[in-house]
Regions:
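Acidic/His-rich structured neighborhood in mature extracellular/periplasmic domains
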Residues: 115-165, 224
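Active-site acidic/histidine clusters and adjacent loop/turn architecture
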Residues: 39-111, 168-178, 182-185
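Extracytoplasmic
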Residues: 103-105, 129-133, 219-221
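Extracellular "leader-to-stem" segments immediately downstream of a signal peptide or signal-anchor
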Residues: 11, 20-64, 283, 287, ...
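Bacterial N-terminal signal peptides
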Residues: 3-15
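Sterically constrained small-residue positions within well-ordered secondary structures
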Residues: 7-10, 101, 125-127, 215
């Protein structure tokens, strides 16, 4: 077992690197030649809400800012200016926060949504580009959140051993279940060890479990992705999820030598990303201003 953990350790550490809610994520550089124009826009593009493209290559028109504080939620890093999303995403946050209050699941600590007009971010994310993605902490930090706080999210996984820590408990599992139960959700990304724990809890099985997917990082937050809004033809639907709850050999792969090797090959955000949709150039334009070229 210790031999297994020895070679698994590099994979687990690399798994932590792409997260958006820890110190490494906030400084993780993007690929060379990255289009920085999207991160320089301060306001949403006016117009009817449109999610354009796909999570890793797209933009959003008519985005709305999530209030930094509301009934049952708080945005933990407002200085990042990433509290914008499609109106459907804000509705989802309000509904989940309301359920969390009713079921005593605690305050929703909200990480990144997206930029005012979506698009690629210079640090931390490959996706979050079309206003339908949001990061949520598994729970509040050990110290109370205050203005200008640099509090870190509690981690659920010991990255040296790959085992769940004492911070993992029934409340966290119920929060993930509540988050995945919404019909608006396409999928939720969690650390592979968390997915395995949910699979092993036979009393918690249900259709929602299929939407919870293992992915690199996500030891200190989970990533919710919504379905394309109804009637939004510019939004590209992701590949359908495999049938079943995902508690089979596909989950075992994440603890394999092949997974470790794959993690080592992962590049920075933006590397190998699909081309941006042509419609996004008009989303980036300001009224009365000439088109700008990517640097």
């Amino acid at each position: 077992m210790w031999g297994l953990m020895f070679w698994l350790l590099p994979f687990l550490v690399l798994s932590a690197a792409p997260t958006a809610l820890d110190a490494s994520a906030s400084s993780q550089p993007a690929a060379r030649g990255f289009d920085l124009r999207w991160s320089r826009v301060a306001t949403p593009k006016p117009g009817s809400p449109r999610a354009i493209g796909q999570p890793g290559a797209g933009c959003v028109q008519g985005a709305v800012a999530l209030p930094l504080r509301g009934p049952g939620w708080t945005v933990v890093h407002p200085e990042r200016h990433r509290e914008f999303g499609h109106p459907d995403l804000l509705t989802y946050v309000r509904e989940l926060a309301s359920r969390a209050r009713r079921e005593k699941l605690g305050l929703l600590c909200v990480g990144d949504l997206g930029q005012p007009r979506g698009g690629p971010m210079p640090t931390g994310h490959r996706s979050h580009q079309i206003g339908l993605d949001i990061d949520l902490w598994y729970g509040p930090p050990a110290k109370p959140l205050t203005s200008g706080s640099t509090a870190m999210p509690p981690t659920m996984v010991d990255l040296r051993t790959g085992k769940l820590l004492s911070a993992w408990n029934d409340r966290v599992a119920r929060l993930i279940e509540a988050a995945a139960a919404s019909p608006a959700v396409d999928r939720i990304f969690v650390h592979p060890a968390i997915k395995r724990a949910l699979c092993q809890d036979k009393g918690r099985a249900g259709p929602w479990l299929q939407r919870v997917r293992p992915w690199w990082g996500h030891h200190d937050h989970f990533h919710v992705r919504l379905r394309c809004p109804t009637g939004d033809t510019d939004c590209k639907e992701p590949q359908p999820l495999p049938a079943g709850p995902g508690c089979d050999a596909s989950l075992d792969w994440w603890f394999s030598e092949d997974a470790r090797a794959t993690a080592a090959k992962r590049g920075p955000p933006g590397e190998g990303a699909p081309a941006m949709p042509e419609q996004c150039e008009s989303v980036l334009e300001e009224e009365g201003q000439p088109k700008t070229k990517a640097p």
